[in-house]
Amino acid sequence: MTVKANKIYDKFKKSNSSLFWCKEKKYEDLWGSINDLLAVRESLKPLFVTVTSSKKKLKALKDFCQREGLILDFKKYDASLDEKWNQFLDREKHNDNYNIFISKKKELINKAKKMVRRGFTLNEGYNSKEFGLLLGYPSCCVENYDKVNILKSLKPYTCNKILFYTNILLTGTGSNCRLASHSLCSFNCKKTIELNKKILKVFKKEIPDYYCFLIKYLKKPLLFWINGKQGNFGLSDTLTVFVFDGELKNNVLNYKKVHLHFPINTAVKLINSPSVKEIESMVKGDRLVIEKKNIKVYKDKKLLIKVKRGKQSAILVDPS
């Protein structure tokens, strides 16, 4: 089913309204960047590069770096985004856009600035191996960036088990719910697991409430639908993910609530999306019965709907 992401997102965005966000005031404007910022501060990564069109976000990053003794540099660029993107980014049509570079070493920032392509936007990524290594990504992930598509390792019609340390599926409108910020070579990548364990230790000390939220949320069972290209960059624009507050036993998932994650660009078309009726039924329901070709959604003992599974639809993952 093809639908506009913004139509579904507007209808169901309240489903995620209670999702935890950092209560620490110094982090409240750093949505989606905390893991990378703390990784650079703790020398777990040498460099963090991001992009924003928000002067508020730029100021928050400057304040953080000044407070924590990090170097920040930025470079303006001209991005010709359409009106839907402008509305999504909540900015004026001709507002400034910034590539932002954060590190402890000025020479790394200078090197990264030379490598950045003009016109980098949320739709594009850097595919240079040299750039990936400069950012401190694991060498195995960098080497396999354009060779391995980790989504293909998650099989349809079954239950996929992964470690919560490598759960990078909760991107898009919930991209604060993650540890790794790079494309993985596999869900069992030892170097990524080691890095993310260290990042979690920093969270536990620095932001204990957020730490407790993450280790619980990243372990929740989920269903996802793949939309469009399955590239390793920008999973946030290819996945629709439903996270269940519940427990999966054998083929039955009993749950109390559903959290919905949509592509970060809500103007995109979802070419492979559950219908509004299917979403409404899962939000209303409290139990899923997982069959090979279908998922039955129940409320109490009443069958609400059957959701078809496919090669790219309703793929079940149970992190632990």
Q: How would you name each of these model-derived features?
A:
Residues S128:
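Generic structural marker for isolated residues within well-ordered, non-membrane alpha-helices
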Residues T2-G119, Y137-E143, K147-S320:
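A conserved ligand/cofactor-binding region detector
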